[in-house]
Amino acid sequence: MSVHELKRPLAVEWPAELLGDLPKALEQLHHWAQITPLHTALRHKRQGQWYAWRWIDALRDVERLADGLRQQGFDEQSRLALSGAFEPNLLLLALAAQSVGGQVLTLADDVDPEVLHQQLWRIRPTHAYVQDRRQVRHWQSANRLDFTQLLGPTEPAQHLQRWWQPAGETALWSEEGTHWQGGLAVLLEQWLNSGHGLAFPESQASARRDRSEVAPTGLLLSPARLQHLADEIESRLARPGTWRRRLCDWAIAHPQSGLRRLLKNRVRKLLGFQRLAYIWQPLKANAETTWLAEFKRDIA
């Protein structure tokens, strides 16, 4: 592949997506690493245990990854394709690639092999990072990166022996992946703009349990995932038309009802929302369910 080919504007179409320039991202990372170096920046559950990255750890990892990328031939003319669940490795690698000056693209992690091959032929990444082992064989044409090799020898992420929440600690939460169109930009911007910690579950299957352990103060979720949460709430309520459901509907319709507060507190605790104070949503949000509307009304 020639340099001239790489300089051509990419005709990127979903399920592939180009991560736009985030000019302040590295500056913000340096900022938080300087003023709150020991505060937790990232959390991720792995094999049943929570791990944490302080802001100073995140900055150092980005710098190490940038050096590792350069050693793998990544430069201003390169393209890095990312696919998989959002978690610390993926976010830090995206920031490292941008710091080198190369392009970062995401490819939805839920496409079938035929679509995947078409997209890889179209975007022609010079390097790739794929998490799902089931997908690896479909990325044979790409120059797949080994995260551990890129990072080099370093201290392992701080292991949280016991999960605890200091009074007033904020924690953003996401349980998404590259299937969320525009999601990576949302996460990076919200995380780095706020300086709040950002936590991720071990998997989609364990998301509710892991979320309950974190009790996040903010949600960074796609409209589709918010709808999934709404459906989960709906599935735990009594069937429509029953007296129990009519009682729930009546309680929601009467703001001063003690029963309403009891029901909402129960739902909040069930979903890990007892500390929830912020729900990210796009400027043009779709219609939302009654329960999510209630949560947002409380927050406001």
Enumerate the predicted regions with their spans.
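Conserved ATP-dependent adenylate/AMP-binding module captured primarily in the ANL superfamily
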Residues: A94, D109-W139, P156-W173, L188, ...
